[in-house]
């Protein structure tokens, strides 16, 4: 019996890392543990999450795919096929970009580029996440980017972040955003993590 109690306590503590609650009431360790356990974000070779570093379009595309039901559809290794002139064959994110574009979560630019190394702003991330949740521009009130940012916050996706329109996202911001995504409401009314 004495061995059973510590085991049960350890099990309960481990499972709480996997239960997503809005980031507003969650501590950093729970948020980080959840996004890492789900494979949405990983640290560098030393395990450092580099939470103050900015995020680029390629990294964000990977996070979108890893947070989606399509995460297993990404071929292992880099692809020899690229949709964009500036995403070279063999680029580490080629497959993630392909899936994110095919699903309509992100788009390229009219000049045929994706700009994978370009940092991403809040409004760009908000638009992509809303599309991931099934929302279309016609479901929103107002115009870009205010409509997207308003819906993003109304769904609780921005809990735990301080950036505003026009500002670049950090890895720390993305960690909270993707944590919040798990409990966000989809267009169909279900909780995202259950879809």
Where are these regions (language model features)?
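Feature responds to low-complexity, polar/acidic, surface-exposed segments characteristic
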Residues: 2-31, 36-61, 65-94, 102-168, ...
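Extracellular, beta-strand-rich glycan-interacting domains
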Residues: 178-180
């Amino acid at each position: 019996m004495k061995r059973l109690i510590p085991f049960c306590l350890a099990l309960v503590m481990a499972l709480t890392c996997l239960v997503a609650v809005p980031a507003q009431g969650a501590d950093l360790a729970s948020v980080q543990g959840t996004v890492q356990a789900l494979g949405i974000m990983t640290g560098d070779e030393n395990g450092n999450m580099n939470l103050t570093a900015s995020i680029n379009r390629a990294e964000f595309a990977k996070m979108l795919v890893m947070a989606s039901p399509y995460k297993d559809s990404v071929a292992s290794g880099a692809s020899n096929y690229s949709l964009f002139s500036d995403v070279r064959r063999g680029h580490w994110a080629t497959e993630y970009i392909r899936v994110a574009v095919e699903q309509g979560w992100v788009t390229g630019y009219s000049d045929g580029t994706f700009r994978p190394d370009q940092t991403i702003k809040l409004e760009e991330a908000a638009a992509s996440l809303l599309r991931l949740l099934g929302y279309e521009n016609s479901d929103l009130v107002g115009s870009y980017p205010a409509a997207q940012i308003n819906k993003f916050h109304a769904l609780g996706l921005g809990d735990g972040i301080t950036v505003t329109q026009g500002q670049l996202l950090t890895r720390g911001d993305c960690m909270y955003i993707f944590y919040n995504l798990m409990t966000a409401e989809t267009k169909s009314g279900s909780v995202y993590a259950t879809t």
